[in-house]
């Protein structure tokens, strides 16, 4: 880790945040860019920009208390959900699930603040959070899959459906699948060891997040002309 290396080498500059906004700036630049994957960085940056900075960003760290944070989490349920350029908000107001995602981000940020000796304790360590209803997802049965395959007249789509079902591939993994991930050699088939091993996935990534992370973990980027026409 870069932070640990700088601490050991004596080149680490301790954070000096005074407000929640200051803390978030240093949390993102010191912790986030070195720890999070691209998709995590982008989603947490969005949560911070839309639901944390506008509401409590100007608060001084010394004024952030458990009581204030409990009220903040409660009030978030009446905040309108923000749509992004590519993803439309599914509900009018924030759901308990999103509030819990905000809490995870703040809990981690305040933990770093305690570690950096900017706060004496984490004000959300024992926070009261809205209850989240867990809904069971509808899962295709083998019969439904068979009907879908029979109704599909596109060979590539039929193959994608088969792979997604038989290999439990997520959409990004399915779209990132290349021949180097596949082992169907005669020897592997004979031994019953034919396999698919996916270590990459296709994602739509915000250019700003890509720049912030200096292209970390990106294996291939489509040319702008391709991205704008497909």
Question: Model-derived features: where do they sit?
Answer:
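N-terminal DNA-binding module of tyrosine recombinases/phage integrases
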Residues: 1-71
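Short, amphipathic alpha-helical segments that act as regulatory/interfacial helices
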Residues: 4, 48-49, 103-114, 161-165
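Charged catalytic carboxylate motif
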Residues: 23, 47, 68, 101, ...
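Alpha-helix C-caps/helix-loop-beta hinges
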Residues: 58, 79, 109-112, 116
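Short, conserved phosphate-binding/catalytic loop or strand-edge motifs used
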Residues: 62-77, 125-130
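Short, basic/aromatic-rich helical patch in the C-terminal catalytic core of site-specific tyrosine
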Residues: 69, 106-110, 174
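Basic, Lys/Arg- and aromatic-enriched nucleic-acid-binding interface segment
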Residues: 82-85, 89-96, 100-102, 115, ...
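Conserved tyrosine-mediated DNA breakage-rejoining catalytic core shared by Y-recombinases
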Residues: 126-129, 138, 143-146, 177-230
